[in-house]
Amino acid sequence: MEDFVRQCFNPMIVELAEKAMKEYGEDPKIETNKFAAICTHLEVCFMYSDFHFIDERGESIIVESGDPNALLKHRFEIIEGRDRTMAWTVVNSICNTTGVEKPKFLPDLYDYKENRFIEIGVTRREVHIYYLEKANKVKSEKTHIHIFSFTGEEMATKADYTLDEESRARIKTRLFTIRQEMASRGLWDSFRQSERGEETIEERFEITGTMRRLADQSLPPNFSSLENFRAYVDGFEPNGCIEGKLSQMSKEVNARIEPFLKTTPRPLKLPDGPPCSQRSKFLLMDALKLSIEDPSHEGEGIPLYDAIKCMKTFFGWKEPNVVKPHEKGINPNYLLAWKQVLAELQDIENEEKIPKTKNMKKTSQLKWALGENMAPEKVDFEDCKDVSDLKQYDSDEPEPRSLASWIQSEFNKACELTDSSWMELDEIGEDVAPIEHIASMRRNYFTAEVSHCRATEYIMKGVYINTALLNASCAAMDDFQLIPMISKCRTKEGRRKTNLYGFIIKGRSHLRNDTDVVNFVSMEFSLTDPRLEPHKWEKYCVLEIGDMLLRTAIGQVSRPMFLYVRTNGTSKIKMKWGMEMRRCLLQSLQQIESMIEAESSVKEKDMTKEFFENKSETWPIGESPKGVEEGSIGKVCRTLLAKSVFNSLYASPQLEGFSAESRKLLLIVQALRDKLEPGTFDLGGLYEAIEECLINDPWVLLNASWFNSFLTHALR
């Protein structure tokens, strides 16, 4: 091969190639294929520039004879082939005189007519794969890319080929000749296979050993290597290449790439039907707390003691009665269950020593509410495998529900500030490194914005309830244990406060698998009259249990106090995640942090302080039918936190599906906004996948309606 190179190429080109290789510590005698590739590339660059001039009128002309006309200026500046220092000097001087953006990598030519740098590529592989690698490396809109292959194909940025047909034909003919010459000497195959992908500094991450073998084994058919596949995947250009590729890969696939324009997307279709109902494990905005300040009673911190103490702060109890029955339930049983709780709490007080936990008597009303003996008997498969008509229960399709306004109100409420702090700042040691100092500063600013947020109250309430329920489920499997729903906070003045929201009674809980269900009955205090939005409370039986005196601007008013009772269930895995709800704080902090980082990298200094302290600046919070909503940085923190908390409270398969599928549509719309000219195939299928998740879940329906607002404003 070395002999061939020295015979085939002009001695000046050979010398430049040797010099270039030596600069990188490579030996032309050993790396002969690389030697040939560099010579070829140099020759193409020179041929690209040959005979092209700019006349005195600034027009591009072709002059092939040795016309000694001094007024002609070379159209192209050749950068390739110079030593690095000289090459960068030329590039800098061009940038200074023309104002063109300075490229990150050394380009090959500069075109004085079009005022742009040109990156020339010569490839033994497919032009579009090599083009994408180049584009990936260059990462600049300003540098023009032009790729030639040894088979006569070419590809250039925006299909703008710079040169006339004849000049390009000359280059293609020369490349074809080189290929023929190599083939006749038996050198072509080795040369063709030796081409490596473009390396960029940041992507020189090698996968080796077992991981490499696994990667190569798991490639789709028709791909020889991981690099090949990577380039192919990165290379989505909606110009026809991909349709051909898809049809090569499978006869069943025929994808027509459709351009995605402002008029393409339609709004998501939300389901019709009765309004959706509340399905959280505990009440949110409607919860009412019975509280004690500065608790110092005997046994303080033991939930049952705290609960009894809180119950004693209220004097307005009255004979309970059902005000909103549960359509499908036996409502008198819910009433009896509450009366039983009151009676058994009274019994505890009459005892000399209050116990630490309370197991309820297994009355008929509790057995009914907790589904005791309701589970079908389990039969060993061996005993029934011969039954001819063995089949699974038919299950009904879920009934579609429409979006109701209460879920938006719930979300708004979760973003609000309360008058208590729900977060104790953990003591973390002194900062040692500067990065720790920045981290502490960010954490402290963020905490200040969210510690009083209602979403933080929901986190603490969720953590407490799930921890207590999981503990009881393991410690008292067969008992109907009474579990108070408690939270702790600090008032504005810094006084400690213990709150009681109501009670849970747990059913039998022999939880072997993560998904085994434990039933529980929840009984929660509230001042919300259920008759105002009966559809929200479909799953509840609501009792009126007392009258509460409230201080208002016009003096004291008496309001009825309600008890929201329902049967519910959860599993080990759900309780485990519920116990980890504090992660929501971390997730929203990270989202805020990425906003700070973006700001800091623009300003080239840490912007944490300015970010939180510049009260005049507003930030986008979300979309509503009115347009993009904006607010203070504190509001952004609380909104992000509330979203994260609701994702946890309303976790469901519908949410998983909606998030994953709608994200794809979101990315396409973002690409359109960024003027990246996205193309799609089977957009109808994507809409189907998204809309199949819009059934009856209130949080998913709300997110879908927000998504529609976003579509409207993004595509204006």
From Swiss-Prot:
Subcellular location: Host cytoplasm; Host nucleus
Chain ranges for the short sequence motif Nuclear localization signal 2 (NLS2) as given in the UniProt record: 184-247
Pfam families according to UniProt: Flu_PA
A GO molecular-function descriptor: endonuclease activity
EC number: 3.1.-.-
InterPro entries named in the record: INFV_PA, PA/PA-X, PA/PA-X_sf
Modification comment: Phosphorylated on serines and threonines by host kinases, including human casein kinase II.
Sequence motif Nuclear localization signal 1 (NLS1), residues: 124-139
Residues the entry annotates as binding Mn(2+) 2: 80, 108
Keywords: Cap snatching, Endonuclease, Eukaryotic host gene expression shutoff by virus, Eukaryotic host transcription shutoff by virus, Host cytoplasm, Host gene expression shutoff by virus, Host nucleus, Host-virus interaction, Hydrolase, Inhibition of host RNA polymerase II by virus, Manganese, Metal-binding, Nuclease, Phosphoprotein
Domain of life assignment: Viruses
Amino-acid positions noted as binding Mn(2+) 1 in the UniProt annotation, renumbered to this chain: 41, 108, 119-120
GO biological process entries: cap snatching; DNA-templated transcription; symbiont-mediated suppression of host gene expression; symbiont-mediated suppression of host mRNA transcription via inhibition of RNA polymerase II activity; viral RNA genome replication; viral translational frameshifting
Cofactor(s) this protein requires: Mn(2+)
Cellular compartments per GO CC: host cell cytoplasm; host cell nucleus
Record's function text: Plays an essential role in viral RNA transcription and replication by forming the heterotrimeric polymerase complex together with PB1 and PB2 subunits. The complex transcribes viral mRNAs by using a unique mechanism called cap-snatching. It consists in the hijacking and cleavage of host capped pre-mRNAs. These short capped RNAs are then used as primers for viral mRNAs. The PB2 subunit is responsible for the binding of the 5' cap of cellular pre-mRNAs which are subsequently cleaved after 10-13 nucleotides by the PA subunit that carries the endonuclease activity.
Homology family: Belongs to the influenza viruses PA family.
Subunit structure comment from the entry: Influenza RNA polymerase is composed of three subunits: PB1, PB2 and PA. Interacts (via C-terminus) with PB1 (via N-terminus).
Name listed for the protein in its UniProt record: Polymerase acidic protein
Source species taxonomy: Viruses, Riboviria, Orthornavirae, Negarnaviricota, Polyploviricotina
Gene symbol of the encoding locus: PA
